[in-house]
């Protein structure tokens, strides 16, 4: 366990009942981080997952947009797991990157102005097309759909400071306390 802890930069409790991580994913993430460091780049990761300290079993099987038994349908289904964003954050930091921002998808997209964008593009559309746009918007941002299930993390080289999506630019004056 100590070897795994050192590799992933994550303390595994003795009470931990489940250890879920992909050595191959860690390896690829470290390679990507080194490329970012040497080229002054960044990485934006958006996926479903969780921020908790404790690892948990999130292995699941999905077929025809429905969850099913991993062992009963594995040849005809997508097998996946939730990303442990706390672990991901530790790997990125241990690779020398700076975490510039982290949020759930709802806040991230709203900070980028997705609601205003939906209003603008739907302004002159027929009613049914407007309904479709706002249904899709709800799916992306509603906390019961993708809004809180999906997480966003942005990591860059130490000398880059980019905050789009992580600061509410529409209310920047309030953020900076410019309005008394």
Q: Where are each of the predicted segments found?
A:
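Long, Lys/Arg- and hydrophobic-enriched amphipathic alpha-helices
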Residues: 3-180
């Amino acid at each position: 366990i100590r070897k795994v802890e050192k590799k992933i930069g994550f303390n595994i409790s003795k009470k931990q009942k489940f250890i879920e991580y992909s050595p191959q994913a860690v390896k690829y993430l470290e390679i990507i981080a080194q490329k970012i460091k040497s080229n002054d780049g960044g990485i934006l990761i958006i996926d479903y997952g969780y921020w908790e300290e404790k690892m948990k079993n999130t292995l699941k099987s999905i077929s025809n947009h429905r969850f099913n038994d991993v062992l009963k349908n594995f040849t005809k289904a997508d097998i996946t797991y939730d990303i442990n964003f706390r672990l991901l954050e530790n790997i990125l930091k241990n690779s020398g990157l700076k975490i510039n921002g982290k949020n759930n998808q709802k806040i991230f997209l709203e900070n980028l102005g997705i609601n205003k964008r939906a209003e603008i593009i739907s302004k002159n559309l027929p009613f049914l097309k407007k309904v479709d746009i706002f249904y899709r918007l709800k799916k992306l941002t509603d906390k019961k759909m993708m809004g809180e299930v999906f997480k966003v993390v942005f990591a860059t080289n130490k000398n880059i400071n980019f905050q789009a999506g992580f600061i509410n630019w529409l209310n920047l004056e309030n953020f900076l306390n410019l309005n008394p």
